[in-house]
Amino acid sequence: MKTISKYVSVLLVAALCFTACDDWMNAGPEGATKTADQKSDAASQNPEAAAADISAIYAQFIQLYAGLGDLGYSRHNDFGYAAICMFTEAQGMDFVSPNIGYNWFGFSDWTAVRDNTLTTTSGLISHLLWNEYYKIIRACNTITEGVDRENPGTQLHALCQALAVRAFCYLQLAQLYQFTYSEATLQKPCVPIVREGMTAEQQEANPRATVEEVFKMIKEDLDFACAGLDGFVRADKGYVNQAVAFGLRARANLVMKNWAAAAEDADKALQLSGATPLSIEECGKPGFADNTAHNVIWANIIVETNDIVQTGIINWVSHMSSFYNDGYTSVAATRWISSGLYEEIAATDVRKGWWLDENLESPLLDAPGLSNMKEAIQSQEMPYQNVKFGTGDNSSSGMGAAAGDWILMRAEELILIKAEGLAKSGGDGAGVLANFVQTYRDPSYTVAQHGLGIEDEIWWQRRVELWGEGFAWGDIMRLEKDVDRSNSNNWPKAWASQGVKAGRNILLWRIPQSEIEANKGINEADNNPFEAL
């Protein structure tokens, strides 16, 4: 609480002090841009340069004010990719937040979030998402511009990482700005492609590429990365390796309805990574904040010296973990599961303990050694509040507690991709699903217990297993599901009735005003239409 008060008083100073740093290899004489040949020469003369550029890519994921800082705004929900995950989760039906002033992620109001202007608080969110992804893409292009793909030499692994991360960004963007990949959408406008080889004039007048064009590049980049990262040993889980590349391609294949390929890639990623799911016992305590856990394949590694941690409150732990007593969750801006989904979870499923019940109880709070965490949450408990996410340091309530890693890929997700891919390609997806849940979550589980077909059962498992981790919106779009909040009693009244049928234009995010003004290839007529709820 004291940190929140402190930051309100220094927010304007922080905004004035914010600067964006471009990598040295992008700067040429008199501020000009170096050519690809010049960058390649620089990299060969200074091998540390490519490593620095790679680090810059991953740093962009966790940069303070990355989305809005260049536009002159300093928002407490602008702390990198984890913030995007929270925004998109709030658009669905399972991730509930209170409708209060301290809730920086209360964007469950459909009409507000579809605002793309710079003159409203809600309109800033469209800019935040867009800018964050394209800044990461720009950092990736710093590598791809300077390396010959046909003859990358010692820069092969750097190139492959850049291509994989770029593909990740475009895959995320594609699921925000157009309906899912299908024969009906292939020629529909998606997002502008920014990549190596483009002239300044092409970038300044860059129209929306089609869905087909965007996914063609995603697939080409991931194919190259999957092959080129063979044998690469990364320094830590913050870097993309071959396992991550196969996992990303599994995600892309799932969206593209390449079911068998998705299952195959997911299985390959699991084999390469050696990652295994958390056990029932391990799931029985708060977590999902430590990249060293054996189920984690890729993560944003966050340490105490990172700017987002030094703020105390402008980080995902402050907004998500119920156990951090000096962040926004300590003033009731907590995250809950929808009561309807919670009630569907069996009492024998360890994941039911990831949220408080209607009596404010969870077996996770009684886990050995967690008495301090139980005390931390008691002042602001709400029914169905999450206790899934721990902090960076479960023994601390200070700065170390805010340094939680953000998990980008874990074994459980890949198993669910494998199950879905097999189920939709004639394989034994049900067997894979049953084995996972019975072994690692609920020994009493049966695939038929929710009365759903196998495809919807896998989606149900994803909704529970991956709750809060940034997958919900992509699943709603690719599976063409309605957003239905009617079966829950804990949605704030203002948002509870905001159900949306699949296929409506209101599901599409709108290209931000600043992009339309800066990009000669896009005008307001090219934007996704605004649709009233």
Q: Residue locations for each model-derived region?
A:
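Short, surface-exposed recognition loops and adjoining beta-strand edges that mediate ligand/DNA contacts
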Residues: 31-41, 76-84, 177-187, 191, ...
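Sec-dependent bacterial lipoprotein signal peptides
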Residues: 1-19
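Membrane-proximal, proline-rich intrinsically disordered regions
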Residues: 21-86, 327, 332-335, 341-347, ...
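Flexible, polar/acidic helix-loop-strand segments at domain edges
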Residues: 345-409
